[in-house]
Amino acid sequence: MIRNQANKPGRAKAATAARKSPLTKSAAKPAAASGAGAKLGKGVIAVALPSFRRERALLKQGIWPVAGCDEAGRGPLAGPVVAAAVILDPNRIPKGLDDSKRLSAEQREALFDKICKTSAFAVAYASPTRIDRDNILRASLWALSRAVRALPEAPKHVFVDGRDRIDVDCNCEAVIGGDGLVMSIAAASIVAKVTRDRLMCALAQDCPGYGFEQHKGYAVPEHLAALDRLGPSVHHRSLFAPVVAARRKHQPWTDVPEPDLFAEVTVVTSTEISLEA
């Protein structure tokens, strides 16, 4: 083996260069364990987990309860925007809370059940009709406000994900990227996401053929193809561009009243759900 390498100077030089390469050196060492104090190599992005620091600071000042709120479903072509507000119990915070987008469906479902058992929370919907009437941003902010107001106990401070504050009867603090920074917002993001995903699966039974149970109303190729083939359903947001194009193709579009499933406010405490028409 040594004789063959010596007879091929090009290969020997390559082997020597590889031994001297910093990339080879770093690859030879196992990666440091993740977590606090771990040293990360070049090109590795450290992802911070949400913390309870902001909520705990307010609690020490006597400001409690504190709620976090977030929404799911701004981007889809169909279904409601779902907003959630959560008041975590400082002594019973579920382990593993994170931005819902960084969790698998199985992780979200498991955490949703834990949040239901340990926290006070409320959910509000902005229906496709309201989205068409008010625009998606205003409808989302409206739903967030309604979710906070529907909490079983009025919060004294609210953290909301994003740039915009909402209309509530207490201090409201907007936190950009809050679902990845503030634990109560992360919990709200999970509640909103799981609730909306379940609703879209229910809509798939009400309107078969669109694949709502798979894509949850987002503009994936399969959804666009079904929309082009079948035309819009009552659950589609009629002013979103792909829906407008499909409606023009499938004239006339029958105007069907919205189902009771999309009552404007859903109050959720513990594991009980009641729809208010």
Swiss-Prot record:
Its EC number is 3.1.26.4. Manganese or magnesium. Binds 1 divalent metal ion per monomer in the absence of substrate. May bind a second metal ion after substrate binding. Its cofactor is Mn(2+); Mg(2+). GO terms for molecular function: manganese ion binding; RNA binding; RNA-DNA hybrid ribonuclease activity. A divalent metal cation binds at residues 70-71, 161. GO terms for cellular component: cytoplasm; ribonuclease H2 complex. Residues 64-252 form the RNase H type-2 domain. Residues 1-32 are annotated as: Disordered. Keywords: Cytoplasm, Endonuclease, Hydrolase, Manganese, Metal-binding, Nuclease. It catalyses: Endonucleolytic cleavage to 5'-phosphomonoester. One of its GO terms (biological process) is mismatch repair. It is found in: Cytoplasm. NCBIfam families: PRK00015.1-3. Belongs to the RNase HII family. This is Ribonuclease HII. It comes from Bradyrhizobium sp. (strain ORS 278).
